[in-house]
Amino acid sequence: MPQLQGLNHLLFSVSDLEKSFCFYRDVLHAKPLVRGRKLAYFDLNGYWLALNEEPDIPRNEIAHSYTHMAFTITEESFDEWYAHLEKHGVTILHGRDRSERDKRSIYFIDPDGHKFELHTGTLQDRLAYYRDEKHHMTFFE
């Protein structure tokens, strides 16, 4: 049976990136890592915290949000995990199109519609990709 490798990252959908950026930085003392037009990444005491700005969705409609919890899996266990989810009748969602440098993910929902992700990449992989490809972003280190 496949095993989870640990928590990968937390992502929250926010209606106002500036307001949320200040809250997580100033109130929770999260350390800013990168900020783009619609996203920001923090180190929250060793945890990768991501904010995605989604201003036009109802805040009470979870099904419309990209907000999710992601767990780390190995690249080698990716297919095993996919088969495991299918075997248990889990609803697997079509993930966003992404570069190979952004690694691989399986998105799925629980019976109440809460989104989860099994991800093979790391924060360092993502930041390296963004540094090379996303020139509009501001990096803090």
Swiss-Prot record:
Mg(2+) binds at residues 9, 68, 117. It is found in: Cytoplasm. Signal peptide: none annotated. GO terms for molecular function: magnesium ion binding; transferase activity, transferring alkyl or aryl (other than methyl) groups. Keywords: Antibiotic resistance, Cytoplasm, Magnesium, Metal-binding, Transferase. GO terms for cellular component: cytoplasm. Residues 6-121 form the VOC domain. Its cofactor is Mg(2+). SUPFAM superfamilies: Glyoxalase/Bleomycin resistance protein/Dihydroxybiphenyl dioxygenase (SSF54593). One of its GO terms (biological process) is response to antibiotic. The keyword Transferase applies. Gene3D superfamilies: 2,3-Dihydroxybiphenyl 1,2-Dioxygenase, domain 1. Homodimer. Metallothiol transferase which confers resistance to fosfomycin by catalyzing the addition of a thiol cofactor to fosfomycin. L-cysteine is probably the physiological thiol donor. This is Metallothiol transferase FosB. It comes from Brevibacillus brevis (strain 47 / JCM 6285 / NBRC 100599).
